[in-house]
Curated annotation (Swiss-Prot):
Organism: Olea europaea (Common olive)
The protein's name in its UniProt record: Profilin-3
Record-listed Phosphothreonine modification sites: T114
Disulfide feature: C13-C118
UniProt similarity note: Belongs to the profilin family.
Amino acid sequence: MSWQAYVDDHLMCDIEGHEGHRLTAAAIVGHDGSVWAQSATFPQFKPEEMNGIMTDFNEPGHMAPTGLHLGGAKYMVIQGEAGAVIRGKKGSGGITIKKTGQALVFGIYEEPVTPGQCNMVVERLGDYLDEQGL
């Protein structure tokens, strides 16, 4: 399966039990900041934004004072899982980032998708990639 198929079929799909509800944007990005696959709606990000995200995975809490920045948007960092999952909130939407052995899985959502639904979609694929050694 291509990386783009993972984004299209596992991240940008309808939320289970909620036909028509899906993430606004999603991507799989290597730890080095290279995009493996992304939805057409995923924001263009700056290298320093990706560096900040990687630093927060290695030093949990690094982004708490300044927020998580992606594609010029600022998210307030909320409770995640140290070294494994970063979650952010912005208005009625937010972001979930799951770190795997080689990649970062991004999901961005707006209402009516809930934070819990975004977490489920992103973390399910992230856990699968981890199990595959990716």
